[in-house]
């Protein structure tokens, strides 16, 4: 970690760690953010990733990780579900807005639909990605909307009180395979991001 921080600071032109910078990096580490992937990138890529860091919206810098793995690829294709607002905490906003990527966002929570449409230009699907297509499932929209989830998975992140207070409604499901066919996704995806508050395994279980 020290080596990585020193490389980052070198790109920023620092030879001594400022207290504010040290506090920022320490806070990132305390929240589980891993910068280990930066140890493997070239100096030129590192400089670009450092420049992009303030633009990153992803909670754990997943967008920067993807760029580092794909050589700062432009024009890639992503699939992300649950997309929420499409910007805050988004793993793909940076890829679309600054690297010309296209893709598919899936988000069944009604509270996000208006903001998602305003924030993104890619394909947006409001069905709930699940292991099968055409089912009607109960959905919980919590007071903290980032934690919205399918009924039956609320125990993952919601307290009993928060679950009881959640707005409930039915959502229509689509399998991952059918979602890709529906929107004519390419045969090879550059990045698949899944954040569904507990139902990830069910989504991928029958995906071939």
Please place each PLM-identified region on the residue numbering.
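Phosphate/nucleotide-binding beta-alpha loop and adjacent structural elements of enzyme active sites
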Residues: 2-208
């Amino acid at each position: 970690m020290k080596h990585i921080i020193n490389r980052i600071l070198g790109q920023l032109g620092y030879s001594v760690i400022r207290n504010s910078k040290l506090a920022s990096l320490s806070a990132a580490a305390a929240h589980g953010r891993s910068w280990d992937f930066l140890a493997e990138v070239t100096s030129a890529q590192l400089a670009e990733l450092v420049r992009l860091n303030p633009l990153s919206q992803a909670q754990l810098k997943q967008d920067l990780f993807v760029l580092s793995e794909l050589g700062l690829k432009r024009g890639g294709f992503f699939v992300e579900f649950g997309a929420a607002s499409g910007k805050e905490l988004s793993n793909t906003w940076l890829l679309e807005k600054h690297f010309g990527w296209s893709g598919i966002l899936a988000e069944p929570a009604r509270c996000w639909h208006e903001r998602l449409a305003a924030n993104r230009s890619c394909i947006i699907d409001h069905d709930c990605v699940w292991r099968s297509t055409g089912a009607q499932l109960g959905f919980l929209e919590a007071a903290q909307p980032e934690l919205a989830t399918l009924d039956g998975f609320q125990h993952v992140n919601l307290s009993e009180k928060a679950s009881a207070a959640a707005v409930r409604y039915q959502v229509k499901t689509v399998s991952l395979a059918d979602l890709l066919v529906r929107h004519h996704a390419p045969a090879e995806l550059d990045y698949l991001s899944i954040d569904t508050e507990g139902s990830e395994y069910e989504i991928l279980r029958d995906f071939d």
